[in-house]
């Protein structure tokens, strides 16, 4: 008999995206796994933000779908394209200031739709990750008011929305207003595998899957 366990048990199979995972990424491996797990082979995935994790997102299971990145920094686009020239990236000037989040944009949908790129309406989006633009630090940063509202307008009824840095006031209040109250989606904190310094990720589940989401071990209801 063959007593070599390596010949009996097949080696673990890793997803393609895991080759591009780095501990420098601000989402935990468990959080990323949960997002990637929502992608079907034909899913369309919209990512607000561009970074060293972008090649990883572009290698999800949606091989027959599309992964699009929206980024407001031309310098950052140029930097990433040097290493990953085949990424589908669109530059966008949000024309917003996070200091005006609640005085100008909150519950003013006409202002939130300013600078909305019409091409986003041409695709049925199955998964959306809001991880940009800059919403902390410098006072002149655009904030994530618009991407959160846009996500509420273009996500499929059965689609999945994730908002990163959700502990911050803008992300929290705009998500509650436009994803939770307007769409009836229930928020769940995705906290699997988080370590110190990694920020809050909230999953806004489609109404049809809220029961299964609530029973999942990966996420905890707010």
Located regions from the model:
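A short acidic, Gly/Pro-enriched loop at the edge of an enzyme's catalytic core
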Residues: 120-127
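Short, flexible/disordered intra-domain loops and linkers
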Residues: 99-108, 136-144
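Glycine-rich phosphate-binding "P-loop"
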Residues: 10-30, 34-43, 132-140
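A Trp-anchored, charged/polar loop motif used as the substrate-binding/catalytic surface
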Residues: 104-119
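Juxtamembrane luminal stem/stalk of type II transmembrane Golgi/ER carbohydrate-processing enzymes
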Residues: 1-22, 217-222
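C-terminal substrate-binding/active-site "lid" region of AdoMet-derived donor-dependent transferases
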Residues: 133-222
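Structural motif
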Residues: 46, 127-131, 162
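SAM cofactor-binding core of SAM-dependent methyltransferases
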Residues: 28-100
């Amino acid at each position: 008999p063959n007593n070599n366990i390596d010949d009996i048990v097949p080696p673990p199979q890793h997803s393609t995206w895991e080759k591009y995972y780095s501990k420098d990424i601000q989402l935990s491996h468990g959080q990323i796994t949960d997002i990637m797990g929502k992608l079907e082979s034909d899913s369309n995935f919209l990512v607000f933000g561009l970074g060293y994790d972008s090649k990883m997102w572009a290698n999800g299971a949606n091989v027959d779908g599309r992964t699009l990145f929206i980024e407001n920094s031309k310098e950052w686009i140029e930097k990433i394209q040097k290493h990953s020239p085949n990424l589908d990236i669109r530059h966008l000037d949000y024309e917003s200031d996070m200091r005006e989040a609640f005085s100008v944009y909150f519950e003013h949908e006409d202002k939130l739709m300013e600078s909305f790129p019409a091409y986003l309406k041409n695709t049925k989006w199955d998964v959306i990750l809001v991880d940009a633009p800059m919403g902390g630090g410098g006072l002149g940063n655009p904030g994530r008011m618009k991407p959160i509202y846009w996500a509420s307008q273009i996500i499929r009824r059965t689609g999945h929305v994730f908002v990163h840095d959700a502990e911050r006031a803008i992300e929290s209040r705009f998500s509650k207003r436009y994803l939770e109250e307007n769409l009836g989606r229930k928020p769940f904190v995705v906290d699997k595998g988080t370590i110190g310094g990694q920020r809050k990720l909230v999953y806004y589940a489609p109404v049809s899957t809220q029961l299964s989401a609530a029973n999942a071990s990966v996420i905890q209801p707010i």
